[in-house]
């Protein structure tokens, strides 16, 4: 499955996908001081509630408007999921034309929402 994470200023939304099917989704309050271990423990608990484990997650990606949490999520993925977690941001190819004066100023949250609608 694919784990997708959208870290917002107040809430973090994430879900698991199998192909085009959304398997499960969750959200919790964004805590800026969260560590990779805390994120891993929270994810593990939520996966287990739905009969899933870390081994079921084969890929992941994160979008974050909270810069200090990006390394925590990527570290969590390496430590607990066993793979690198790409971060959506400037330079990530989306397959969608971005027609604004300075694409590097486009927030990751708006980018992923636009791609989802595209």
Where are these regions (language model features)?
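Short beta-strand-loop/turn "lid" adjacent to the catalytic site in phosphate-handling enzymes
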Residues: 50-105
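A polyampholytic, Gly/Pro-enriched intrinsically disordered region
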Residues: 102-115
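Short, acidic/turn-prone active-site loops that include or flank metal/cofactor-
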Residues: 28-33, 90-92, 112
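Short glycine-rich, Thr/Ser-proximal phosphate-binding strand/loop in the N-terminal lobe
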Residues: 2-45
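A general structural signal for well-ordered alpha-helical segments in protein cores
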Residues: 40, 70-74, 111-114
């Amino acid at each position: 499955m694919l784990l997708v994470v959208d870290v917002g200023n107040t809430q973090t939304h994430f879900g698991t996908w199998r192909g085009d099917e959304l398997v499960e989704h969750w959200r919790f309050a964004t805590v800026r001081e969260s560590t990779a271990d805390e994120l891993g423990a929270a994810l593990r608990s939520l996966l287990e509630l739905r009969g899933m484990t870390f081994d079921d997650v084969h890929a992941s990606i994160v979008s974050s408007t909270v810069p200090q949490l990006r390394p925590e999520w990527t570290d969590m993925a390496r430590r607990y999921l066993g793979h690198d977690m790409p971060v959506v941001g400037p330079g990530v190819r989306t397959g969608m034309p971005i027609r604004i004066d300075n694409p590097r100023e486009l927030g990751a949250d708006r980018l992923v929402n636009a791609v989802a609608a595209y």
